[in-house]
């Protein structure tokens, strides 16, 4: 009887873990200093190898920084004392289609664009409190005081 209950439960937990892994839109590659990631009131300490998903905010403290890689190969380097939101992160590796909107609320971010910006530059944008940047280049920096 225990086997009948435990085995399906274990399989369910494994499937949930696989789905959580698939939900990742990117991975933290480097973290220096105090960096947190999350949505709303649910913040966690950022660690190299940790995942990021759509709607996550990356918050860096004074002197801190974070580098993350998205599924399409886009690299984001978030500078010190910054707040960056991954507003829309969609990329289908099969069709090579998607949409990327990054909202820089404070601080600086360097972006090295990936596959999505190369194939569909109109689908990639960086917004700030006062502007919207359409991405046409491959490597640039945006700063918000």
Where are these regions (language model features)?
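Absolute protein N-terminus
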Residues: 1, 20-21
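Flexible, surface-exposed loop/linker segments and immediately adjacent secondary-structure boundaries
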Residues: 21-145
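Bacterial N-terminal signal peptides that target proteins for export
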Residues: 1-7
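Classic N-terminal secretory signal peptides
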Residues: 8-13
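N-terminal signal peptide c-region/cleavage motif recognized by signal peptidases
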Residues: 15-17
């Amino acid at each position: 009887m225990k086997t009948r209950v435990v085995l399906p439960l274990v399989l369910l937990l494994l499937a949930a873990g696989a789905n959580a892994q698939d939900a990742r839109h990117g991975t933290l590659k480097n973290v220096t200093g105090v960096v947190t990631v999350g949505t709303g009131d649910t913040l966690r300490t950022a660690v190299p190898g940790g995942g990021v998903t759509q709607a996550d905010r990356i918050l860096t403290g004074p002197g801190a920084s974070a580098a993350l890689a998205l599924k399409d190969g886009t690299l984001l380097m978030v500078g010190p004392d910054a707040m960056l939101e991954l507003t829309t992160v969609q990329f289908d590796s099969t069709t090579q289609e998607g949409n990327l909107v990054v909202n820089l609320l404070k601080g600086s971010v360097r972006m090295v664009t990936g596959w999505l910006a190369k194939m569909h530059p109109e689908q990639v944008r960086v917004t700030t409190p006062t502007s919207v940047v359409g991405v046409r280049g491959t490597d640039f920096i945006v700063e918000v005081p």
